UniProtKB/Swiss-Prot annotation:
Organism from which the protein derives: Bordetella avium (strain 197N)
Source taxon at top rank: Bacteria
GO BP field: lipoprotein biosynthetic process
Chain ranges passing through the membrane: 17-37, 57-77, 89-109, 118-138, 173-193, 201-221, 237-257
Pathway, per record: Protein modification; lipoprotein biosynthesis (diacylglyceryl transfer)
GO cellular component: plasma membrane
Protein name in the entry: Phosphatidylglycerol--prolipoprotein diacylglyceryl transferase
């Protein structure tokens, strides 16, 4: 059994300015996306996208993540509460974001961006998909440093006591599982897969399948939200949202493979 290390929530102090670890992780996430995006454009893997296009895409994607993530949390996790307290939807500083909602927000941004550029949606999504996992990993590291989103009780040797959980039960460090699978492993998989020419849409399909599968598996070790618990079939909300994500990616992968095989 391991003891959760108590981190100072402030990573860096610059006079009166305090930079928190969680905010620093978000900055790192977008820095990863920007630097890797520039690299892909330089390698000719961004079609006719320019560095300016990348900057615009990141800026609007941030808005999509924040707005979509917040609305996704409201609709997927606490619709009844926010129906009674609608003004609190805007209270972002109180926490409450959904990855799946943020993904929907980014998809809408990419649809509008592709239309503006006069290119296909998959030109944009295939370009951006390999850039996302390291950003996701940075976010999960921020969750771990904050001591939040801990796992279910476990007797494994690396199980960890999270004082913020309100008990002294050793638990899965599920944030680190997600950092490893949804961050590092998925990044390596997509970076390798996208390094060679693929049918349009297949890199996006691999992202949907990879994230959906990894998130579904890790949810078996992650403590369910206390206000929801487990839902139908003994699955968590995260699993129910990840299942259609995986299946959608699988269907897209098969369709793009068939379409490619028919082309001379």
């Amino acid at each position: 059994m391991l003891q959760f290390p108590q981190f100072d929530p402030v990573a860096l102090r610059l006079g009166p300015l305090a930079i928190h670890w969680y905010g620093l992780m978000y900055l790192l996430a977008f820095a990863f996306v920007y630097l890797l995006g520039r690299y892909r454009i330089k390698r000719g893997q961004g079609g006719n996208l320019t560095y300016k296009d990348l900057e615009d895409l990141i800026f609007y994607s941030v808005l999509g993540v924040v707005l979509g993530g917040r609305l996704g949390y409201v609709l997927f996790y606490k619709p009844g509460y926010y129906l009674s307290h609608p003004l609190e939807i805007a209270f972002l500083w109180e926490g409450g974001m959904s990855f799946h909602g943020g993904l929907i927000g980014v998809i809408l941004v990419m649809l509008l961006f592709a239309r503006k550029k006069g290119v296909s949606f998959f030109t944009i999504s295939d370009f951006i998909a390999p850039l996302i996992p390291l950003g996701l990993g940075a976010g999960r590291l921020g969750n771990f440093i904050n001591g939040e989103l801990w796992g279910r009780p476990s007797d494994l040797p690396w199980a960890m006591v999270f004082p913020q959980s309100g008990s002294m039960l050793p638990r899965h460090p599920s944030q680190l599982y997600e950092l490893g699978l949804e961050g590092l492993v998925l990044f390596a998989l997509l970076w390798w897969f996208s390094s060679k020419p693929r049918p349009s849409g297949q890199v996006s399909a691999m992202f949907l399948m990879g994230y959906g599968a990894f998130r579904f598996l890790v949810e078996f070790t992650r403590e369910p939200d206390n206000f929801l618990g487990l839902l139908a079939g003994g699955m968590s909300m995260g699993q129910w949202l990840s299942l259609p994500m995986f299946l959608g990616g699988l269907v897209l992968f098969v369709l793009t493979a068939r379409r490619s095989s028919r082309q001379p």
